[in-house]
């Protein structure tokens, strides 16, 4: 132990320092130091790891993570360099033994990310998905303006057709009004004619007005009162004429009787 805290547990009495097996001519063991650039808290310190030395002094260290972590292991890769004069002091606090061992090599490793399992890779995939979705969105928007331009055409055509139909209907209604007014004036001017001709004129005007009304159902509710009023005038005028004729006949008969 090479820290100050380790020496604090030692008392002031003298101890025997032994040289370890690494100092033998044919050492049966070797000691190495490992330096990590970053050691995650998810590593399970109670489990054993694996160290593999490959070609070119390349070193791979695999340490298990806590159960349920993603990924299940953490992998470190690096290289080793030999030590020349460095040693390590090992103190056994239970027995009080102090042993000096020779360091063989210094291993420096860096944490690697497992492809497809790390959080960074997951975030990259999410970003790629968002970029792909954003790239698709403009293509969909480009087609919408043309459809929006074409869609308002049909309501405008419908409005134009409705306006034309209303204008045509107004023309027909005005023509019917003028014809009915002319017939009403002609019927009122013929009060001095005979009752038969008045009845025929009344029938013809009634039939013509009926045709006009039947041809334009929308106008019926507006023109029926005028037709009824003119028909009533025809009846009043006809009755007045008949009374006048009867009075004339009675006067002529009374005059002839007086002459006799």
UniProtKB/Swiss-Prot annotation:
Biological process annotations from GO: apoptotic process; epithelial cell proliferation involved in prostate gland development; negative regulation of cell growth; negative regulation of epithelial cell proliferation involved in prostate gland development; positive regulation of transcription by RNA polymerase II; regulation of transcription elongation by RNA polymerase II; transcription elongation by RNA polymerase II
Coiled coil ranges: none
Inducing factors: By androgen.
InterPro entries: EAF_fam, Tscrpt_elong_fac_Eaf_N
Region (Necessary for interaction with TCEA1 and transactivation activity) residue spans: 246-260
Annotated region (Necessary for interaction with ELL), positions in chain: 17-104
Compositional bias annotation for Low complexity: 174-192
Superkingdom as given in the UniProt entry: Eukaryota
Localization, UniProt: Nucleus speckle
UniProt keyword annotations, A-Z: Activator, Apoptosis, Nucleus, Phosphoprotein, Transcription, Transcription regulation
Residue span of region Necessary for transactivation activity: 177-260
GO MF entries: transcription elongation factor activity
Phosphoserine carried by residues: 146, 151, 154
Biased composition (Basic and acidic residues): 116-126, 225-234
Tissue specificity annotation: Expressed in heart, brain, placenta, lung, skeletal muscle, kidney, pancreas, spleen, prostate, testis, small intestine, colon, adrenal, bone marrow, lymph node, spinal gland, stomach, thyroid, trachea, thymus, liver and leukocytes.
Family membership: Belongs to the EAF family.
SUBUNIT field: Isoform 1 and isoform 2 interact with TCEA1. Component of the super elongation complex (SEC), at least composed of EAF1, EAF2, CDK9, MLLT3/AF9, AFF (AFF1 or AFF4), the P-TEFb complex and ELL (ELL, ELL2 or ELL3). Interacts with ELL and ELL2.
Biological role: Acts as a transcriptional transactivator of TCEA1 elongation activity. Acts as a transcriptional transactivator of ELL and ELL2 elongation activities. Potent inducer of apoptosis in prostatic and non-prostatic cell lines. Inhibits prostate tumor growth in vivo.
PANTHER family from the UniProt entry: ELL-ASSOCIATED FACTOR 2, ELL-ASSOCIATED FACTOR EAF
Protein name according to UniProt: ELL-associated factor 2
Species this chain originates from: Homo sapiens
């Amino acid at each position: 132990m090479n820290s100050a805290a380790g020496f604090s547990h030692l008392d002031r009495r003298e101890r025997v320092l032994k040289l370890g097996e690494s100092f033998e001519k044919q050492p049966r063991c070797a000691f190495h130091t490992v330096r990590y650039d970053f050691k995650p808290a998810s590593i399970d310190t109670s489990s054993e790891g694996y160290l593999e030395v490959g070609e070119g002094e390349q070193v791979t260290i695999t340490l298990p993570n806590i159960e349920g972590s993603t990924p299940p292991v953490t992998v470190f890769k690096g290289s080793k360099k030999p030590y020349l004069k460095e040693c390590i002091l090992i103190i056994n606090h239970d027995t009080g033994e102090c042993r000096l061992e020779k360091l063989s090599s210094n291993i420096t490793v860096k944490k690697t990310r497992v492809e497809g399992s790390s959080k960074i890779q997951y975030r990259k995939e999410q970003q790629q998905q968002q970029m792909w979705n954003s790239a698709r969105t403009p293509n969909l928007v480009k087609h919408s303006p043309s459809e929006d331009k074409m869609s308002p055409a049909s309501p405008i055509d419908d409005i134009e057709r409705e306006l034309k139909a209303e204008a045509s209907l107004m023309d027909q209604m005005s023509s019917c009004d003028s014809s009915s007014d002319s017939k009403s004036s002609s019927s009122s001017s013929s009060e001095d004619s005979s009752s038969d001709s008045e009845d025929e004129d009344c029938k013809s005007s009634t039939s013509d007005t009926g045709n006009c009304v039947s041809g334009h159902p929308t106008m019926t509710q507006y023109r029926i009162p005028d037709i009824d009023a003119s028909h009533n005038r025809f009846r009043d005028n006809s009755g007045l004429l008949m009374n006048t004729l009867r009075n004339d006949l009675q006067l002529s008969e009374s005059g002839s009787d007086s002459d006799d």
